């Protein structure tokens, strides 16, 4: 018996998810994320603060973005097959940023 054909998802499927639904798109497959735990959020908040302070104390030009923040690591024309939401992203190259997030890998 043949295996059922696996559906390939696109960035449009990610955009169509209900508000608050967190997921990543990797090679055409959607990976849903469970809500973060309280401990996870505490650690994320601590790291976000420490990284921001480190950058500011050194007069750095980078920006820190905690999740949810959209990262499009690879772009090939209009065919976006990867969409990630890292816990923390540090962006130093402002040309990577637009209203939707970061285009290219975070720094």
Please identify what each model-predicted range represents.
Residues 1-107:
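Gly/Pro/Ser/Thr-rich low-complexity, intrinsically disordered segments predominantly at protein N-termini
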């Amino acid at each position: 018996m043949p295996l059922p054909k696996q559906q390939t998802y696109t960035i449009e499927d990610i955009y169509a998810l209900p508000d608050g639904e967190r997921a990543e798109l990797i090679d055409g497959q959607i990976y849903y994320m469970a809500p973060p735990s309280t401990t996870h959020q505490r650690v994320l908040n601590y790291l976000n603060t420490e990284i921001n302070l480190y950058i500011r104390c050194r007069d750095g030009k980078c920006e820190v973005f905690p999740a949810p923040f959209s990262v499009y690591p690879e772009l090939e024309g209009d065919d976006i097959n990867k969409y990630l939401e890292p816990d923390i992203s540090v962006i130093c190259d402002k040309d990577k940023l637009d209203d939707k997030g970061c285009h290219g890998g975070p720094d």
